[in-house]
């Protein structure tokens, strides 16, 4: 339960060989702070329906005075939300890393007993806590005192019910879907029970499922091909960094050092998780999940103060995704992403470089985006840029923010260019470097024309195919408000309109919808 404080553990950003424990803002039942503070009609309607939903869950849980308590809970959450840091500001670790000795935590929150809190977590011997949202904690201290005890009790009961609603009674599960599925996301029908069951097993015993998935669906030749692609993309990034005309030699040297220290995990872990001590009962869903959570908590406690396990994978191999870790300076590509539309063993190189090549380039690019660029090649949070180079980088990224701010799927809602900046830098770098890697792989040979499309055209087509998607209005609004990725159509079109080769490949001219004047096109990496 992470209300109203979330505690998590990952590499210490100033000493990434060892784990650090982080505390940050939390405790909202709606997806994000703006749901509580915006005054437009849609936000007000959602808040009204949310209050009714809280009352419904409390009533189903047989908690007295459900309607009154629901109002108190939503009011308390609104006070917490008003003190939450903006999601855009959470990206800057140089401002949000605040390591405080546990003995000094009460100077920030004198009305909160940190010693008892940490003891309940099993972390009573922890020497320091890294506060990510310090101003929130200062404000929370006052909210704790100003809010009556009965409201806190009701809020914590609600938070526990909300966190476990999908595994409680059928009526609570149905009510949970009605709000979070139908109202917030526009989903018309809940998934069948068997699919929800698969998801539960997947989340709880991910590497058990992953081991079976890899054996059935991940041939060795796919991993070999992926390793080649990663090596080629890193080589292309090196060429690009060496050729940048806006970067000084001092910063360039540091960037190349960081690139050379990248590590890649491909497919699946070398050592699978051992779940043999986890007790599982065929007729005790809640108990199974509770025991699994307790086992995971004990696993985290055993790591306190220890060295980071670099062999660990954050998400199992059957998940279609990839990620970059700044403090580990590693890129991770799971087995499940090595399938169409991202990758096809029988497709030609152009399509694969445009699709998976751009994904690889995207993840490498996160090491050099607005957030990842603040970490060096050893994963240490430090400034390795000259002031003039950082200023030039931020001028270029500001123009990218302006471009994405202009994308407006609805009259009353635009993409948040500041919030999505890191992903947009990744997308632009991904297709740019994917294209360069394909050109380098040709090694001067002329690419064949296939089905009337040149090699360069097929790179762009492979990239665009990755982003085919359809959204319900509610889901699109939810994504724009909470997700650091732009909607798919803008990920495809927003990146390519900055790439000169796109104009030549498809004869894009001034009257075309995706045309950008050369002076407005952004090149970063």
What function would you assign to each model-found segment?
Residues 1-228, 232:
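Noncatalytic, helix-rich "gating/capping" subdomain that lines the substrate-entry/channel surface
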């Amino acid at each position: 339960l992470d209300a109203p404080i979330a505690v998590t553990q990952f590499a210490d950003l100033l000493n990434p060989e060892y784990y650090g424990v982080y505390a940050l803002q939390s405790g909202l039942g709606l997806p994000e702070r703006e749901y509580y503070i915006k005054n437009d009609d849609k936000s007000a309607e959602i808040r009204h329906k949310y209050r009714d939903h809280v009352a419904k869950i409390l009533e189903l849980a047989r908690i007295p005075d459900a309607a009154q308590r629901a109002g108190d809970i939503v009011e308390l959450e609104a006070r917490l939300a008003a003190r939450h840091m903006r999601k855009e500001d959470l990206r800057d670790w140089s401002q949000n890393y605040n390591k405080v000795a546990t003995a000094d935590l009460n100077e920030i929150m004198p009305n909160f007993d940190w010693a008892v809190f940490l003891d309940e977590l099993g972390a009573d011997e922890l020497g320091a806590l890294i506060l990510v949202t310090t101003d929130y904690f200062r404000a929370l201290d006052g909210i704790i005192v100003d809010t009556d005890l009965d409201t806190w009790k009701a809020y914590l009961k609600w938070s526990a019910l909300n966190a476990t609603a999908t595994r409680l009674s059928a009526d609570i599960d149905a009510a949970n879907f009605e709000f979070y599925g139908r109202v917030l996301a526009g989903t018309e029908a809940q998934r069948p029970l068997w699919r929800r069951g698969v998801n539960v097993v997947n989340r709880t015993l991910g590497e058990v499922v992953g081991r079976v998935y890899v054996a059935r669906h991940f041939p060795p030749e796919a991993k070999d091909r992926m390793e080649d692609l990663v090596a080629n993309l890193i080589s292309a990034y090196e060429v690009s960094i060496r050729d940048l005309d806006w970067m000084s030699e001092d910063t360039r040297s540091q960037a190349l050092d960081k690139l050379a220290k990248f590590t890649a995990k491909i497919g699946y872990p070398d050592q699978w998780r051992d779940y043999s001590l986890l007790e599982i009962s065929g007729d005790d869903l809640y108990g199974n999940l509770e025991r699994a959570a307790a086992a995971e908590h004990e696993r985290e406690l055993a790591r306190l103060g220890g060295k980071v396990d670099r062999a660990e994978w954050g998400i199992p191999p059957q998940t279609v995704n990839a990620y970059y870790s700044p403090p580990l300076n590693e890129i991770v590509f799971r087995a499940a992403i090595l399938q169409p539309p991202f990758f096809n063993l029988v497709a030609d190189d152009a399509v694969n470089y445009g699709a998976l090549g751009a994904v690889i380039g995207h993840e490498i690019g996160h090491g050099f985006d607005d957030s990842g660029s603040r970490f060096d090649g050893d994963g240490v949070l430090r400034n390795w840029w000259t002031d003039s180079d950082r200023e030039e980088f931020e001028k270029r990224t500001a123009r990218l923010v302006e471009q994405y701010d202009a994308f407006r799927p609805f009259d009353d809602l635009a993409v948040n260019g500041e919030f999505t900046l890191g992903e947009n830098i990744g997308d632009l770098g991904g297709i740019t470097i994917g294209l360069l890697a394909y050109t380098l792989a040709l090694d001067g040979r002329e690419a064949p024309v296939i089905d009337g499309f040149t090699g360069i055209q097929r790179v762009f087509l492979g990239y665009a195919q990755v982003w085919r998607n359809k959204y319900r209005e509610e889901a699109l609004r939810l994504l724009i408000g909470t997700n650091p990725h732009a909607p798919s159509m803008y990920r495809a079109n927003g990146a390519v309109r900055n790439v000169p080769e796109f104009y030549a490949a498809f004869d894009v001219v001034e009257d075309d919808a995706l045309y950008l004047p050369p002076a407005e096109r952004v090149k970063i990496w």
